């Protein structure tokens, strides 16, 4: 799980230009990391590419925190 978190964290830092210390499992994309809805869509697309998977739209809507993304990826691995 740590490896997935590290990869997700790196993508978030690059995409949202946030400090590494802000990216925690509990961090909300919108509330804590100042991402707008377009940022979240782009993050989901980048996660799909990074982890070679497809994230259904209805599943993507449920990914609100870094932890949600990590848990989703781990559940599909």
Swiss-Prot record:
GO cellular component: cytosol; membrane
Domain Carrier: 2-77
Residue intervals passing through the bilayer: none
S-S bonds: none
Cross-referenced Gene3D superfamilies: ACP-like
Protein's pathway: Lipid metabolism; fatty acid biosynthesis
Modification after translation, per record: 4'-phosphopantetheine is transferred from CoA to a specific serine of apo-ACP by AcpS. This modification is essential for activity because fatty acids are bound in thioester linkage to the sulfhydryl of the prosthetic group.
Sorted UniProt keywords: Cytoplasm, Fatty acid biosynthesis, Fatty acid metabolism, Lipid biosynthesis, Lipid metabolism, Phosphopantetheine, Phosphoprotein
Subcellular localization, as worded in the UniProt entry: Cytoplasm
GO biological processes: lipid A biosynthetic process
Annotated InterPro entries: ACP, ACP-like_sf, PP-bd_ACP
Similarity annotation: Belongs to the acyl carrier protein (ACP) family.
HAMAP family (UniProt xref): Acyl_carrier
Entry function: Carrier of the growing fatty acid chain in fatty acid biosynthesis.
Protein's name in the database: Acyl carrier protein
Native organism taxonomy: Bacteria, Bacillati, Bacillota, Bacilli, Bacillales
């Amino acid at each position: 799980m740590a490896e997935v978190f590290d990869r997700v964290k790196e993508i978030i830092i690059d995409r949202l230009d946030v400090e590494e210390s802000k990216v925690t499992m509990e961090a909300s994309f919108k509330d804590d990391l100042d991402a707008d809805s377009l940022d979240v869509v782009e993050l989901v697309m980048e996660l799909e590419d990074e982890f070679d998977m497809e994230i259904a739209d209805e599943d993507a809507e449920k990914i609100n925190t870094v932890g949600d993304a990590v848990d989703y990826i781990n559940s599909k691995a």
